[in-house]
Each structure stands twice: as structure tokens, then as C-alpha cells.
Amino acid sequence: MSKKEIPYKIYLDESEMPKQWYNFRADMINKPAPLLNPATGKPVTLEELSGIFCEELAKQELDDKTPYIDIPDEILQFYKMYRPAPLVRAYHLERYLKTPAKIYYKFEGNNTSGSHKLNSAIAQAYYAKNQGLKGVTTETGAGQWGTALSMACAFLGLDCQVFMVKVSYEQKPFRREVMRTYGANVTPSPSEKTAVGRKIRAEFPDTNGSLGCAISEAVEAATTQEGYRYVLGSVLAQVMIHQSVIGLESKIALDKYGEKPDIIIGCAGGGSNLGGLIAPFMGEKLRGEADYRFIAVEPKSCPSFTRGTYAYDFCDTGAICPLAKMYTLGSSFMPAPNHAGGLRYHGMSSVLSQLYDDKLMEAVSVSQTDVFAAAEEFAKVEGILPAPESSHAIRVAMDEAIKCRETGEEKTILFGLTGTGYFDMYAYEKFNDGKMENYTLTDEEIAASIAKLPKVPGLN
């Protein structure tokens, strides 16, 4: 089809929405390494994992063989409040960059949570409700996940306890208030509420917190209260299963117009958005049906892929969770107060880590001043104020489009616009005032954290 025949926004009909999630682990030749029980060093069992997660979610976490999982009708009906999400052809950005490249972005910010996180929040809350639980606990970085979960829990009548990374709790008070508006109890992490929080505060008295800290507190809170389970917004495979609706919708929309992306780009903190966006395309690559170039974009201040070590590590700072094999900076790593709070995680999804180790995807790291420069250009040209996390993908998508301008190649670029930045104005203020700092880790800082990796006989 010609360029003129492709609309600015491609909206699918509700009848075209995916009815199943896609679990691309089923198509992976090299499966992700199993989660390990830190006490035994052996793969975790369903019974062990069900003590932390809802039973159905524990089953999804351990299932690397079932390619498609039916989406319960109750979840589909909830999705219809904000899905299908638009796939946007960035004509204005293309003209601004004077590039022959075609640029598309999947916009996930058209719901009250402001991001893609609601896709998994409603699924996890649904399974918790079906199990008869009183409530759930969780962590949140920038607050998008906590907001999404508070919405889902309010809708289903569940109690919601959120441990929010301290620096984001202070930088993003309005997102905190959205969570409270939906009935969530929000605590800055590390806190005095949990034993692990008190321990971390004693060891790192000046800490700004981290996702790893908040995870530890949320897990402790879940396992010490009757009728509660822990749910999470990223990193684990169950989350990427739910987020596959992003990529599935994107592929359906592109296929309708005969479009095929050459490059697919997503920001990477724990991997939920990136894994969801690439899911059906990676499936085709794994099955040998098509080839794509996948690029994960992470902050230079927290470069798990580009400077981390591929090893077994704890998913949390307090060493409560199972061990996962992933690209990691070490669970004791305390990231700088980067404004992309959702990307301040020491590790990376085991699924994406395996794909990266198998050279099936690439990764780059970018500085936050370059990211915010791209964010402001995008906002002025495309009319959406992007979240700092999303802006990492925007930065690299623009860079790839500029390369096409220089080479004359007419590549098709797809990136994930994970959400809006309307609650991130403190970060934009710092950038506009010229007070934003870049944080680049030294080799010594990384080595010190990596040296504390757990000793796993025969593995680490």
C-alpha cells in the first residue's frame, strides 16, 4: 500500500483484539534457566512459588511449553475500557527528521494509569480475586505499576499495598495520590514497616531506594499476612505473557496494511514492555519465519544488559525472592536517582536475558540528558508528552531514523511508547533548567556490586 493509504492512527475493532496471550518461551530453543530456591539451589516447585504468587500465576511462571493462553472473558471486558490501543504512524516525526524511514509507535498511555502496566495488573488482580485472597502487595518505581494495580484492585474489591521507591515517592507526589485515590496504601521504600526495610536502611542510611529494595519489602509483607500474595509489574515471565497484547495488537495492525518492521525498539528496565512488544515478532524469528532487529534501550546509570554479568542473582535486594539467571549489576546495587524510575532495576528478565545471550537481540544504553532532549522534540512534533522511560526508546528510534536519512535506506521502525509523562514534570523541570545530571557508573562500582553475587555451586 502507498504511504497515503496508511492512517495516522490505526485502531483495531474490538472484535480484532487478541483473545489469547502469547508465551514465546514455547518457541525458544534455549529455554530461560529455571528459577532456583536459594535454600536448596534447586529449581523452585509450583508449591514453593505458590507461597509467594497466586497459584495460577505461579503456573504461568513455570510454563515454558504452552504457546497460547486464553484470556479470561472478565479480563477481556476490562481491556475493552482502553483497548485496542492505537498504533500510530509518526508522519510528523518523519518529516521533522527528514528521514526516508517509516516510524510507528504503539501508544500505551491511553488509560488512567498512564502506561502499559494495566495490561498485567488486571490479570494478576483477577487471579488473586479468583483465589479468594484479601489483597495483594507490590513494589513500584516511577509509580505507573502501582497506579495500574491500585486501579485493578479497586475494580475488583481487593486491598492493595504498595511499596514505592523512596526517590520516586518524593519526586512524583501526584502519582502517589492517584494510587491513594484508588484506595491503595502507599509506603516509601525502604521503610520501617518490614524487617528487610529496616535492615536496608541500617546498611544504606542515605539510600534513595531501589526497585530491588521495594520488591523485598512487598514480598515480606505478602508472606507475613494471611490472605495476601505478592504481584509484580515486570521482570518475570508471567508479566510478559500478559503484556504480549501490545505486540499482538501491533502485528495485527501492521499486517492489515502490509507493513513489516525492520527494527523494533523498547525501553528496558525489567523487561515487561519490551517483552510484550516484541513477543509475536520474536516468535516468528525463533520459528525461522521472519527476521527482525530488536533493540533494548536502558539508562547509562543502570546498564544491566550492556555492562552487567549473566549469572544467577536475587531478584530483590533483601535476598528473599528466588534466584534468577539474568543480566545483573548485582542485587546489592543501588542505582543513582535517575528520573526514569521504572528503569532503575539491577537485573533483567530471565527470558530477555536468554535471548540477549543468544544474540537474538541487541542493547544500548543512553544518558538521561539525551533522552530528555528526544522527549521534548517528540512532544513538540507528535503532540504527546512521553514518560521518561518511554523516551529511551524514542531516543534510539530517532537515532535509527537519522541513520536512514544518512544512508538513504527506507527502513520501517516500530517502538513502544509505554506511557505519558504528565506526572514527571519535576524531571522535565530539571532538564529545562539545565540542572539535570548524567550518571555513568565506574567499572569499580559495578565490580563491587558484582562481587557480592550469591555463590551457587556449579553455576556462579
Q: Residues of each region from the PLM?
A:
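Short glycine/serine/threonine-rich phosphate/pyrophosphate-binding segments
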Residues: 114, 118-122, 138-156, 170-173, ...
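Alpha-helix C-terminal capping segments
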Residues: 123-133, 147-159, 180-181, 278-288, ...
